[in-house]
Amino acid sequence: MNVIKISPRGYCYGVVDAMVIAKNAALDKNLPRPIYILGMIVHNKHVTDAFEEDGIYTLDGPNRLDILKQVESGTVIFTAHGVSPEVRQIAEEKGLVAIDATCPDVTKTHELISEKTADGYDIIYIGKKGHPEPEGAVGVAPDKVHLVESEADIEALDLTSDKLLITNQTTMSQWDVHDLMELIKEKYPHVEYHQEICLATQVRQEAVSEQAGQADLTIVVGDPKSNNSNRLAQVSMEIAGTQAYRIGDLSELKLEWLQGVNTVAITAGASTPTPITKEVIRFLENYEPDDESTWKIERSVPLSKILPRVKTKK
């Protein structure tokens, strides 16, 4: 089968940094145990499973504050998605050692919100409800940050401030953000805007929009909780006009999707381990619709190959 390997794809620097921080924590014998991650360090189950083998445990819950209630001692790692100031304060009050793996792009958004709300602004924040990144951003100034995800949310806004600013979750579709920003500007013509789609997200979306149209089908390798992976599939369908499916790994690929397909494009979310994506690429490159010996779908990447290598400090 013809395979278009969309580039760039896969890991971004924020994800790699977060994983290296967590990996170094696992290697640091001086850190108090147990070591917990407040939510998924990045949105990929293969990564969290690999960290568990290294003795770092991922805690889950509806929000970071509730997750933190599960921890009474040891070390906590804040994920790449960021946390609210309240979470940081409670971790400190509990006497926990806190390690911050927040993506620098997310930190920049938090700083923008803090600066503008201190100057009297209300913030209209475009993001996905229930996702940890908006949770942390709203938590910077809960009374001043208004989360919107849809046109209905914008219609429901009732803001009277002369000082309004729009910003957004870093992993949203840039086209969705643009459309929602335009609706907000229609309602509040005096609003200022500061688009915060991170560069890694933007170039990956643009690559799909430009390259997926050459294929009959797009496969996005990424975790179901990965917003940027889901947005890549959306971009393929809505911008490039090519049917797309998101899979967590090779085991989720369906042979019926390949019927009548001559060329498939493949990309991966920013938190998808490279070996997982390479395994899917190898299968598709070897797949022949008339050769049953190429049809076997079997994931074989061991957890030991998932995490980046970190040099041990001497």
From Swiss-Prot:
Cofactors per UniProt? [4Fe-4S] cluster
Q: What CDD domains is this protein classified in? A: lytB_ispH
Q: Which Gene3D superfamilies match?
A: 3.40.50.11270, 4-hydroxy-3-methylbut-2-enyl diphosphate reductase, catalytic domain (3.40.1010.20)
UniProt-annotated catalytic positions = E133 (proton donor)
**Cofactor note as given:** Binds 1 [4Fe-4S] cluster per subunit.
Q: Which positions bind isopentenyl diphosphate? A: H43, H81, H131, S226, N228, S271
> What residues does [4Fe-4S] cluster bind to?
C12, C103, C198
Gene Ontology biological-process entries: dimethylallyl diphosphate biosynthetic process; isopentenyl diphosphate biosynthetic process, methylerythritol 4-phosphate pathway; terpenoid biosynthetic process
InterPro entries, from UniProt?
Answer: LytB/IspH
Reactions performed catalytically: isopentenyl diphosphate + 2 oxidized [2Fe-2S]-[ferredoxin] + H2O = (2E)-4-hydroxy-3-methylbut-2-enyl diphosphate + 2 reduced [2Fe-2S]-[ferredoxin] + 2 H(+); dimethylallyl diphosphate + 2 oxidized [2Fe-2S]-[ferredoxin] + H2O = (2E)-4-hydroxy-3-methylbut-2-enyl diphosphate + 2 reduced [2Fe-2S]-[ferredoxin] + 2 H(+)
Q: What's its EC?
A: 1.17.7.4
Query: Which pathway is this protein assigned to?
Result: Isoprenoid biosynthesis; dimethylallyl diphosphate biosynthesis; dimethylallyl diphosphate from (2E)-4-hydroxy-3-methylbutenyl diphosphate: step 1/1; Isoprenoid biosynthesis; isopentenyl diphosphate biosynthesis via DXP pathway; isopentenyl diphosphate from 1-deoxy-D-xylulose 5-phosphate: step 6/6
Functional note: Catalyzes the conversion of 1-hydroxy-2-methyl-2-(E)-butenyl 4-diphosphate (HMBPP) into a mixture of isopentenyl diphosphate (IPP) and dimethylallyl diphosphate (DMAPP). Acts in the terminal step of the DOXP/MEP pathway for isoprenoid precursor biosynthesis.
NCBIfam families according to UniProt = ispH_lytB, PRK01045.1-1
Q: Which family does it belong to?
A: Belongs to the IspH family.
Protein's recorded name: 4-hydroxy-3-methylbut-2-enyl diphosphate reductase
